[in-house]
């Protein structure tokens, strides 16, 4: 019988217990991964990245969870593959895909599990008597900057004793931002080109081919004539960046893609 903790680690392989499980049982160095015969995990890692590129979401099925070692191992391997590719767009899309998939899965968790995930991610929440979740103001501000709907602004929130009240869906959205940031930052860690095993290089090439096909299939547009041709949503992000305000990873990706 597989324990719930192990299944949870497979479902959310960015959690510390997933990293601890893998590090206890598998040599995570590139040399070690090559020797462990990690072909099934490598195949799943490629699938993770392709899910992100093609579906904009990394899906994890019940069968994936049962293959918990493969599932946990596929996450750091996917990070290595994306890092090796050194493509900023792929980095951001992969981070978004992992975080979006995690968000959808978190919506089906109990309050207890959701709060546990938040605590492990450094986004601690407290359940109040009305089943609302309370998040410290600095933590909330650090994550909610990614959202621009009026109801996310602090002035429109209920604040109690240094905590912002959020419902479980909003709490999961905050966790999604944290997962996105974590995954993106991990893909920035350099991988020595000479240390990458041959089978990993083939996997990177497979991902690169998918990306190149997506780029080739993009419709071509005539060059913009001026600011008057820019959609309002793009103009708002550009103006924010020109004013020195912090644009989210996703906003910068949108601007770069459009321009």
Describe the residue ranges of each PLM region.
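ATP/Mg2+-dependent ligation/transfer catalytic cores
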Residues: 1-2
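Generic helix N-cap/helix-start motif at coil->alpha-helix transitions
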Residues: 247-252
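Contiguous, well-ordered alpha-helical segments that form the cores/surfaces of helical PPI scaffolds
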Residues: 253-259
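Extended, well-ordered protein cores
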Residues: 5-7, 11, 18, 25-246
């Amino acid at each position: 019988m597989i324990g719930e903790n192990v299944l949870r680690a497979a479902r959310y392989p960015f959690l510390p217990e997933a990293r601890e499980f893998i590090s206890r049982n598998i040599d995570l160095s590139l040399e070690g991964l090559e020797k462990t015969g990690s072909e099934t995990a490598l195949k799943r890692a490629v699938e993770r990245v392709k899910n992100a590129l093609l579906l904009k979401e990394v899906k994890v099925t019940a069968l994936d969870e049962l293959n918990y070692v493969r599932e946990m191992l596929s996450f750091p391997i996917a990070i290595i593959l994306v890092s090796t590719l050194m493509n900023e767009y792929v980095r951001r899309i992969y981070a978004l895909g992992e975080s979006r998939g995690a968000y959808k899965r978190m919506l089906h968790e109990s309050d207890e599990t959701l709060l546990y995930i938040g605590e492990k991610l450094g986004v601690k929440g407290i359940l109040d008597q009305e089943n609302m979740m309370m998040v410290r103001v600095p933590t909330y501000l650090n994550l909610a900057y990614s959202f621009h709907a009026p109801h996310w602004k602090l002035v429109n929130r209920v604040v109690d004793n240094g905590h912002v009240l959020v419902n479980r869906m909003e709490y999961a959205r905050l966790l999604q931002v944290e997962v996105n940031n974590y995954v993106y930052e991990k893909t920035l860690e350099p991988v020595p080109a000479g240390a990458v095993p041959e089978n990993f290089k083939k996997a990177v090439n497979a991902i690169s081919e998918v990306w190149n096909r997506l780029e080739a299939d993009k419709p071509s547009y005539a060059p913009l004539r001026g600011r008057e041709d820019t959609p309002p949503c793009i103009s708002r992000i550009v103006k924010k960046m020109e004013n020195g305000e912090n644009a989210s990873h996703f906003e910068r990706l949108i601007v770069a893609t459009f321009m």
